[in-house]
Amino acid sequence: MFNKILVVCVGNVCRSPTAERLLKRFHPSLTVASAGLGALVGKGADPAAASVASAHDLSLENHCARQISARLCREYDLILTMEKRHIAALCDIAPEMRSKVMLFGHWDSEREIPDPYRKSRDAFEAVYTLLERSARQWAQALNAEQGKP
């Protein structure tokens, strides 16, 4: 059973904090956190990501970027990444974690979710839509696993 989920992207300021908060919204009983492979440690959410999230009534307030580590990975039951190359990078950091690493877009035809960092607001909106859809799909799958409707 997956009760603790870690969401991973590169900087931990755009995609993973948004995905973290969306998973918490759709499945409040989960423990969800996020981290980055090349995190902008200590930074808050990207202003464009925060603005788009806010437009959808989702707050990224008080987010603080942190760096992924093998130790951090071991604390979670499931690790969700935005891109396939992130899976490979995590396996380099902690090879024993491979069996619990999947794409955030797994239920959406194994879709990779592109990085909107330093791109247009439209790019952030498109990524938000992908993240929201995938978060809903994960919440449904996790509810089914736990025998909930």
From Swiss-Prot:
Belongs to the low molecular weight phosphotyrosine protein phosphatase family. InterPro entries: LMW_PTPase (IPR050438), Ptyr_pPase (IPR023485), Ptyr_pPase_sf (IPR036196), Tyr_phospatase_low_mol_wt (IPR017867). Pathway: Glycan metabolism; exopolysaccharide biosynthesis. The keyword Hydrolase applies. Dephosphorylates Wzc. Required for the extracellular polysaccharide colanic acid synthesis. Probably involved in the export of colanic acid from the cell to medium. Involved in protection of cells against contact-dependent growth inhibition (CDI). Its EC number is 3.1.3.48. This is Low molecular weight protein-tyrosine-phosphatase Wzb. It is an enzyme of class 3 (hydrolase). It comes from Salmonella typhi. One of its GO terms (molecular function) is protein tyrosine phosphatase activity. SMART domains: LMWPc. It catalyses: O-phospho-L-tyrosyl-[protein] + H2O = L-tyrosyl-[protein] + phosphate. GO terms for biological process: polysaccharide biosynthetic process. Keywords: Exopolysaccharide synthesis, Hydrolase, Protein phosphatase. The gene is wzb.
